């Protein structure tokens, strides 16, 4: 039996990596999924079709820059109902602090903090009306452990986690759950420019997507923060 039949989800960062895996996993359980990314064009990678409300069990594609308030409002209004939002949009550049770029830091804050805030706000506004829903934020284990060359990324992810904690308290009276999945090393395109790491020891995006499905289909409990790491630990 498909556990999410009759529900609608919006996934940011849905063109690749964890976001794309989550979109596929949710659709496999019967959800209608609108997968969004600033790398996508409306209706598909070539922009040759309008945004289509997804049928149950299907994924529709749409462009979305999560830091663009007007576009976020538009996208959130395109689903007939909104049961689940997965904030998986992310960007990361890495290097020692002595070489840190303020422009790159600002971009990461725009995506991970501003973008998450805007998406969470629009999700909460809609979910409050029905007094139910679930917002999942794909965070990072860097909030718990210091890694060299990750200062700007860590700052952005810590901001996102702080936002999620406050959101969880504000959403609770409306029966809306908020979850932060603090992911360890996962084999996604964020590692493409970082040679020297053994990606065979990393988790696959599908592993996190499977875990996400296991918690969003359990309305009798609220998983608010959880660290998910590969068996090898920090890589």
PLM features: residue spans?
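Conserved glycine-rich cofactor-binding loop
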Residues: 15-16
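Conserved glycine-rich Rossmann-like NAD(P)H-binding loop of the short-chain dehydrogenase/reductase
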Residues: 29-46
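C-terminal helical subdomain
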Residues: 173-176, 180, 197-235
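Residue(s) in the substrate-gating loop at a strand-loop-helix junction
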Residues: 140
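Active-site-adjacent segment of SDR/Rossmann-fold oxidoreductases
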Residues: 145, 166-176
């Amino acid at each position: 039996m498909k556990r999410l039949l009759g529900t609608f989800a919006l996934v940011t960062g849905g063109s690749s990596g964890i976001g794309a895996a989550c979109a596929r996993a949710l659709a496999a359980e019967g959800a209608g999924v609108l997968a969004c990314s600033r790398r996508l064009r409306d209706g598909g990678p070539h922009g040759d079709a309008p945004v289509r409300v997804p049928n149950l069990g299907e994924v529709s594609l749409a462009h979305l820059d999560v830091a663009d308030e007007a576009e976020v409002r538009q996208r959130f209004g395109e689903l007939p109902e909104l049961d689940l939002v997965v904030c998986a949009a992310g960007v990361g550049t890495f290097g020692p602090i002595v070489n840190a770029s303020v422009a790159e830091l600002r971009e990461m804050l725009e995506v991970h903090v501003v973008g998450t805030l805007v998406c969470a706000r629009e999700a909460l506004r809609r979910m409050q009306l029905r007094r139910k829903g679930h917002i999942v934020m794909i965070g990072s284990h860097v909030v718990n452990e210091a890694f060299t060359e990750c200062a700007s990324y860590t700052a952005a992810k810590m901001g996102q986690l702080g936002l999620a904690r406050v959101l969880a308290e504000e959403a609770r009276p409306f029966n809306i759950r908020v979850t932060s999945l603090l992911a360890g090393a996962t084999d996604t395109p964020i590692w493409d420019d970082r040679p020297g790491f053994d990606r065979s020891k990393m988790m696959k995006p599908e592993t996190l997507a499977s875990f996400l499905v296991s918690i969003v289909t359990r309305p009798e409990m609220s998983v608010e923060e959880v660290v998910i790491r590969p068996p090898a630990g920090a890589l």
